[in-house]
């Protein structure tokens, strides 16, 4: 599907997937605009702290059953970290275990100043990842 941008894509995904009370795991920090999109669809947000390597997957909660997880793995916004392949695999395994989707906003993935590009989450699990 082609949209006018990430905001429209996230709004459409939220309207399609979310019902009042559904849980969404988000990176912390993340923009207020993204939080508002999910809240407007009735979601309860659960923030996962971010470090220099993106979302800290060791902190994914065992007691939550999210509808989806929102992440910016190639260039975490606003801090800029890139999620290493080990964490990407952990995130995919968690989504399989909890039967949730991963919403991958591949913001700035094409801009690399060092090293080879890291595989997108969607490339690692195309059936579970919604790629924006």
Labelled PLM ranges:
Residues 1-99, 110-111, 116-130:
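Conserved core of the PLP fold type I
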């Amino acid at each position: 599907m082609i949209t006018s941008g990430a905001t429209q894509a996230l709004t459409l995904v939220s309207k399609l997937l979310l019902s009042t009370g559904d849980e969404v795991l988000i990176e912390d920090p993340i923009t207020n605009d993204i939080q508002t999109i999910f809240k407007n669809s009735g979601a309860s947000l659960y923030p996962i702290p971010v470090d220099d390597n993106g979302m800290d997957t060791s902190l994914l909660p065992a007691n939550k059953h999210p509808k989806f997880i929102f992440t910016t793995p190639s260039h975490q916004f606003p801090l800029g970290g890139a999620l290493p392949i080990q964490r990407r695999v952990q995130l995919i395994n968690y989504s399989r275990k909890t039967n949730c989707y991963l919403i991958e906003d591949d913001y700035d993935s094409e801009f690399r100043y060092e090293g080879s590009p890291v595989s997108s989450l969607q490339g690692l699990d195309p059936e579970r990842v919604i790629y924006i």
